[in-house]
Swiss-Prot record:
Record-level GO cellular component terms: chloroplast
Gene that produces this protein: rbcR
Molecular functions per Gene Ontology: DNA-binding transcription factor activity; transcription cis-regulatory region binding
Protein name, entry field: Probable RuBisCO transcriptional regulator
Localisation: Plastid, Chloroplast
PANTHER family documented for this protein: HTH-TYPE TRANSCRIPTIONAL REGULATOR, HTH-TYPE TRANSCRIPTIONAL REGULATOR CYSL
Similarity comment: Belongs to the LysR transcriptional regulatory family.
Keywords, alphabetical: Chloroplast, DNA-binding, Plastid, Transcription, Transcription regulation
PROSITE patterns reported for this sequence: HTH_LYSR
Domain HTH lysR-type: 6-63
Protein role: Trans-acting transcriptional regulator of RuBisCO genes (rbcL and rbcS) expression.
DNA-binding annotation, residue ranges on this chain: 23-42
Organism: Porphyra purpurea (Red seaweed)
Pfam family, one: HTH_1
Length: 317
């Protein structure tokens, strides 16, 4: 059998250089010396008889041949990792790694608790959590970098035929006010009252912001007329701003369970308006599904109930 003109280590090095943008940073990330990295790439180029990087640039830039090898090499490495994980599974959850993805709010407030439950039952399984935008997490699932993910938005159009999307649970979005706000003394507030508030909001491209705008529009409320005091990219920063009396905000109920319990923000009900979004589980049906993934789905995810139902996971355990 003819020997391959490259090794897995060389593919890992190529991938690291492309990711880090330089030989030095790639060497640091792989805990090897820069000369060792350079020598491996020189040997690889000689074996393939092609140049993999543009010479003369400060940044390590792949040639067309380098990009081609990176694309196929990434698939080879992913398949090797999949094979190792399948073999680990033969030990019946006595090892291996579970990689879970989540969009921002879900990853911050829901997943740590569910992962904690899983780790109590299967302490030998290492669990990694990746939290990014819905778009980035969807691509990570599609590429096999994440086993499954829970997202609060829609899968990108180009991945809808690739990923399996399953409705999971409803997540209610609450209008929160500072405890000192006059509206906190009222019952339900009227739709017109929303135009009198000053809002702390996520940026217009965020999934939650889009859901809020859509649902409010369906109820005849024009969110473009809202007075936006400031836009922040962190739910924690938004909650702190509300607690400090800077304005009102819409956030997931799962993000304010502690604040409601301590009574430091007010959940204002809007008359005849409830804002909800659907959380979804996404997987790539064409990728290997580990026992850890199946177990997490069947034993842990089924325990979830929405905070707006005033229940806890403990009620079901």
């Amino acid at each position: 059998m003819t020997d391959l003109p490259f090794t897995l280590d060389q593919l890992r090095i190529l991938k690291a250089i492309a990711k880090e943008g330089s030989f030095k940073k790639a060497a640091n990330s792989l805990y090897v010396s820069q000369p060792a990295i350079s020598l491996q790439i020189q040997n690889l180029e000689r074996q393939l008889n092609v140049a993999l990087f543009e010479r003369g640039n400060k940044k390590a830039t792949l040639t067309e041949a380098g990009s081609l090898l990176l694309r196929y090499g990434g698939r080879i490495l992913a398949l090797c990792e999949e094979t190792c994980r399948a073999l680990d599974d033969l030990q019946n959850l006595q090892g291996g790694t579970l990689i879970i993805g989540a969009s921002q709010t879900t990853g911050t407030y829901l997943m740590p608790r569910l992962i904690g439950l899983f780790r109590q039952r299967y302490p030998q399984v290492a669990v990694q959590l990746q939290v990014h935008s819905t778009r980035l997490i969807s691509w990570s699932v599609a590429n096999g970098q994440v086993d499954l993910a829970i997202i609060g938005g829609e899968v990108p159009t180009e991945l809808q035929d690739v990923l399996q999307v399953t409705s999971y649970a409803e997540d209610e979005l609450a209008l929160i006010l500072p405890k000192s706000h006059p509206f906190s003394k009222l019952g339900d507030i009227q739709k017109e009252d929303l135009y009198r508030l000053r809002f702390i909001a996520l940026d217009t491209q965020s999934t939650i912001r889009k859901v809020i705008d859509k649902v409010l529009s369906q109820h005849g409320i024009d969110s473009s007329r809202f007075k936006i005091e400031m836009e922040l990219n962190s739910i924690e920063a938004i909650k702190n701003a509300v607690q400090s009396g800077l304005g009102a905000a819409f956030v997931s109920v799962s993000a304010i369970a502690k604040e409601l319990e301590l009574g430091i923000v007010h959940w204002a009900q809007i008359e005849n308006v409830t804002i909800k979004r659907m959380l979804s589980i996404i997987v790539n049906p064409n990728r290997y599904k580990s026992k850890a993934t199946e177990t997490f789905s069947q034993e842990i995810l089924t325990l979830f109930v929405t905070p707006s139902q005033h229940k806890t996971l403990g009620d079901k355990l």
